[in-house]
Design a protein with these regions (language model features):
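Internal catalytic-core helix/loop-beta-alpha segment
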Residues: 95, 99-111
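Hydrophobic packing residues in well-ordered alpha-helices of helical domains and bundles
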Residues: 5, 35, 105-109, 147-150
Length: 173
């Protein structure tokens, strides 16, 4: 799953690197995110998520098993993100900066992805199967479910990226 997530990330980075700064900063309407803000949201969501998982892993004791409830909540979450609806970002992953720095976000995303890889390598399967991650809406999920969430979350926002770039006022190359 790490490989698939990395391929997805590389696809987004290739796309963004091909765009001009004015295209990355284009907002389709007032109070709507531009491409930089979409990327900021994705990177922030992963940073906050990994920080929470690391905090849970430090306590080690009292981490519950991820049971059928986690499975069902994850299924609902993945289904919701595949639907053509738009959701307001949870406060923890809100984007306040209108023009986040692209290079900084690339660096942060590299770092958080290395952190995910390290987490997986340094944890045994029994630990990774526990409810380590708290999604703001879906509740507690295990590491595999967290990775699945990242994948569908990014795919959800890739649709948003395409909508922004198809906007009639999107700057020409």
């Amino acid at each position: 799953m790490v490989k698939e997530l990395e391929e997805q990330r590389e696809e987004i980075l290739r796309l963004y690197q091909e765009l001009k700064p004015s295209q990355r900063a284009f907002s389709p309407a007032p109070h709507k995110w531009n491409l930089l803000q979409v990327l900021r949201h994705l990177v922030t969501a992963e940073i906050q998520s990994v920080a929470y998982i690391n905090k849970k892993l430090k306590s080690r004791s009292g981490i519950p098993e991820a049971g059928i409830g986690s499975y069902l909540r994850n299924l609902l979450l993945k289904t919701a993100l595949k639907l053509p609806f738009r959701f307001e970002a949870p406060k923890i992953a809100e984007v306040k900066d209108k023009h986040p720095d692209f290079e900084t976000m690339i660096s942060e995303w590299d770092t958080v992805r290395k952190g995910i890889q390290k987490l997986i390598e340094q944890s045994d399967e029994a630990t990774l199967a526990r409810a380590l991650y708290r999604h703001p809406k879906a509740g507690m999920l295990n590491m595999k479910q967290f990775m699945e969430f990242i994948e569908v979350h990014i795919a959800h926002h890739q649709k948003q990226m395409k909508r922004i770039m198809k906007h009639p006022s999107f700057p020409a190359e």
